[in-house]
């Protein structure tokens, strides 16, 4: 198309790859659910996102499948967000502040192929 400034589609997966390429050694710092501070680089994050995408593919996940997440903001959820999107699947994030009944309804309605959660949500 004429008039477009970009030469490729703007995809979520390209964001982490751009960061890994142009800011490889910059740190991502977050506090894990368990308490300690977690530090690693954009390069390491991109590698882990690709590994997650490959693992989900080997488990039979296909483009368009829905992958559910119930997690607090942290490095693991970041990796899920970018890893799932990079393989063409849908990252279905759930709000941890919803009631148990609401979460059950939403999970069943979405028909998530896989579901990831932080241990703080496991009874």
Task: Describe the predicted segments one by one.
Residues 1-6:
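A detector for short, charged/polar N-terminal pre-domain segments
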Residues 7-29, 47:
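A short N-terminal helical cap/helix-turn-helix that marks the beginning
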Residues 10, 21, 62, 108-110:
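Structured loop/turn residues at beta-strand edges in well-structured enzyme cores
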Residues 15-17, 58-59, 86-123:
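Structural core segment of the AMP-binding/adenylate-forming
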Residues 28-82, 99-104, 108:
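Conserved AMP-binding/adenylate-forming core of the ANL superfamily
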């Amino acid at each position: 198309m004429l008039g477009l400034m970009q030469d490729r589609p703007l995809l979520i997966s390209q964001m982490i790859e751009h960061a890994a390429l142009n800011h490889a050694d910059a740190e991502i710092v977050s506090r894990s659910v368990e308490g300690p501070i977690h530090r690693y680089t954009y390069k390491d994050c991109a590698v882990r996102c690709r590994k997650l995408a490959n693992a989900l593919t080997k488990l039979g996940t296909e483009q368009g499948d829905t992958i559910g997440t119930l997690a607090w903001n942290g490095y693991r959820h970041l990796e899920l967000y970018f890893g799932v999107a990079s393989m063409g699947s849908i990252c279905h994030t759930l709000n941890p502040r919803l009631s148990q009944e609401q979460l059950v309804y939403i999970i069943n309605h979405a028909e998530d192929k896989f579901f990831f959660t932080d241990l703080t949500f496991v009874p």
